[in-house]
Amino acid sequence: MGDETSPLNLGTVVSVRGSVVDIRFDDDLPSIHTILRANEGEIVLEVLAQHDARHVRAIALTPTQGLARGMAVQDTGGPLKAPVGKGSLSRMFDVFGNTIDRETALSDVQWRSVHRAPPPLARRSTKSEIFETGIKVIDVLMPLERGGKAGLFGGAGVGKTVLLTEMIHNMVGQHEGVSIFCGIGERCREGEELYRDMKQAGVLPNMVMIFAQMNEPPGARFRVGHAALTMAEYFRDDEHRDMLLLIDNIFRFIQAGMEVSGLMGQMPSRLGYQPTMGTELSGLEERIANTDTGAITSIQAVYVPADDFTDPAAVHTFSHLSASIVLSRKRASEGLYPAIDPLQSSSKMATPSIVGARHYGLAQEIRRTLAQYAELKDIIAMLGLEQLSPEDRNVVARARRLERFLTQPFFTTEQFTGHKGKLVSLKDALDGCERILRDEFKDHPESALYMIGTIDEAKGKAKPPAPATPSEPDSKTEARADPKPAAESPAKAIPGPHPQSGAKPQPETDHAADTHES
């Protein structure tokens, strides 16, 4: 496991309360973060507090079954260590550095402490570069920073893990450096599926995976992020390679810290969180940095409890990120995948000096159009689309086409949706948005833009409709000049405007409501 045994220093278990163990040492008192072993090395503990000159309080990193009062505990003399080096590539580890992929024994690695200081300010790089993901809505509206930190915020079941897995699929193949996936308190099934997918895709040779699953003690979940960063720092500082660090889920790190804090008897703060949450999160996040030798780019899934973005865990995480990608349950229910809310999401890279004047101008125009549509939705729901001015109706048409163009079929969900995955370059994504804003596709049905890659696919997906047909969306105004036909056959107008093109249901509530209005 990588721990170096020091001269024997034995202690005795005084009390066991769940994962917290009090131990008495009569000779040398172990220092903070020292690893202790009991029950013939099967039970691993980490010292978190020194009560007095004889007693320490430790948190268990393994289950404590079999541990009893009076049992001997051995001081290993060192902290928790992680394996670093080329021998760790293509392997899967637990928090102790043990391989869990049933492959050959580990070789060609060094062992380093997981407790390391962030790089000093003098070593940090201030150069700003864009990191392309191949996902249209992210690259256009909230570009990621090379060497930065991006968070995927969302409640349960809105697609955080799917989006993170798709980014792995898209970026690991074109990313020249090393990728590390760190699973903190997530499902064992997801780790197994990810390992198999990466192996089949042929990207495992440049990837390291490390897990502490939700069934493990809070101490293990609390330390696995530090172990992953230790591995990433080796490739950045020693190998001078760029790193891609993917964390699922950073909230589970905070949650594990809350459990540890409660077990240690600390006074809780707001909503039961630990009083040291800000310090603990900073100790992890500040190690993710862009230096003169290389960069660690991090993408982190962040679970938001009960979709409450004012939760202290979400608020503290927001402050460390260069890009915040917010996933919306409403958009997911409408079938607009990826369910990213373009108005709540943001990136500090979206400035003219970094992305260029054209990209910045297009992004602002897209946000403005979508924001106007969001304001008009209440009026449409109450009065109908025909009560809007012609200019507002054009805004609604552009916004709905933009929303559908910014959907994208994922490689990782092909087997569920039936749509073949698409990887779209930033240039193609910008061209598509620009052409929609110029009303180049106003004669195409909205469904032609749904779940496509580049904008040219829309032309092959659906031919422009005949101009005089009452069921077409762009002829709706003319068709309703005479209210009688609409009143006589309201049902006919509902399915006509938007023929479905995929497995997911298309959101057509606005137009369906409009037909009954007249």
Curated annotation (Swiss-Prot):
Produces ATP from ADP in the presence of a proton gradient across the membrane. The catalytic sites are hosted primarily by the beta subunits. PROSITE patterns: ATPASE_ALPHA_BETA (PS00152). Residues 473-485, 507-518 have a biased composition (Basic and acidic residues). F-type ATPases have 2 components, CF(1) - the catalytic core - and CF(0) - the membrane proton channel. CF(1) has five subunits: alpha(3), beta(3), gamma(1), delta(1), epsilon(1). CF(0) has three main subunits: a(1), b(2) and c(9-12). The alpha and beta chains form an alternating ring which encloses part of the gamma chain. CF(1) is attached to CF(0) by a central stalk formed by the gamma and epsilon chains, while a peripheral stalk is formed by the delta and b chains. ATP binds at residues 154-161. Its main location: membrane. This is ATP synthase subunit beta 2. SUPFAM superfamilies: C-terminal domain of alpha and beta subunits of F1 ATP synthase, N-terminal domain of alpha and beta subunits of F1 ATP synthase, P-loop containing nucleoside triphosphate hydrolases. Its EC number is 7.1.2.2. It is an enzyme of class 7 (translocase). GO terms for cellular component: plasma membrane; proton-transporting ATP synthase complex. Belongs to the ATPase alpha/beta chains family. SMART domains: AAA. Pfam families: ATP-synt_ab, ATP-synt_ab_N, ATP-synt_VA_C. It catalyses: ATP + H2O + 4 H(+)(in) = ADP + phosphate + 5 H(+)(out).
